[in-house]
């Protein structure tokens, strides 16, 4: 079940998975799992570097075809909260491949798009199932980012199911 609701400047999506909380945690914190599901339909993630600890950095490359041709987008950030199997919070900024933060407008983002946003993932153990609440603060609820997250979480559910762990 996916529900999207949000304040004006945040995307909030709640999703339940038929999988243990530690598996869902690994989907967010292990690069090989993250690469398998992150991004909208048609996107691939060739690079995912994660130093999952408070103050640790992350660098992710998202590639996709667009009407204007192939696009490669890099995102960098820092982990602010890491509570294993419970809560993960990190910042996210558009960057170059070296993790240098770029102006969002340089990457075609709309005027007023913040240079840094925050992603929070909260997990609740439901006895073999997991409830996840994703909050991406700093982007409007009706932005393309909301649709991108919805697609990514559908891919996440399929990847979790493919693991065959219940």
Question: For the regions a protein language model found, what residue spans apply to each?
Answer:
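A generic structural micro-feature
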Residues: 5-7, 52, 69-73, 111-115, ...
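Hydrophobic ligand-binding cavity/cleft-lining segments
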Residues: 1-45
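Short amphipathic alpha-helical signal-transduction/dimerization elements
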Residues: 153, 157-164
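Short beta-edge strand/loop motif at the mouth of beta-sheet-based domains
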Residues: 12, 32-74, 78, 166
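Intrinsic-disorder/low-complexity, polar/charged segments enriched in Ser/Thr/Lys/Arg/Asp/Glu/Gln
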Residues: 8-14, 21, 57, 74, ...
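Short Pro/Gly-enriched beta-strand edge/turn motifs at strand-loop
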Residues: 31, 58-62, 100-108
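Hydrophobic pocket/interface hotspot
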Residues: 24, 34, 58, 79, ...
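Beta-strand/loop substructures that line and gate deep hydrophobic ligand-binding cavities in soluble
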Residues: 81, 86-150
């Amino acid at each position: 079940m996916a529900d999207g609701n949000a304040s004006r400047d945040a995307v909030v999506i709640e999703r339940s998975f038929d999988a243990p909380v530690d598996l869902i945690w690994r989907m967010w914190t292990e690069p090989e799992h993250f690469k398998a599901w992150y991004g909208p339909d048609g996107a691939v993630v060739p690079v995912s570097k994660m130093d999952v600890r408070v103050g640790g950095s992350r660098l992710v490359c998202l590639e996709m075809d667009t009407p204007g041709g192939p696009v490669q987008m890099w995102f960098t950030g820092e982990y602010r909260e890491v509570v294993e199997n419970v809560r993960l919070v990190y910042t996210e900024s558009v960057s170059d491949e070296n993790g240098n933060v770029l102006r969002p407008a340089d990457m075609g983002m709309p005027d007023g798009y913040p240079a840094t946003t925050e992603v929070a993932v909260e997990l609740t153990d439901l006895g073999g199932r997991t409830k996840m609440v994703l909050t991406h603060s700093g982007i409007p609820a009706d932005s393309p980012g909301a649709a991108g997250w919805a697609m990514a979480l559908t891919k996440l559910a399929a990847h979790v199911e493919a693991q065959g762990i219940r």
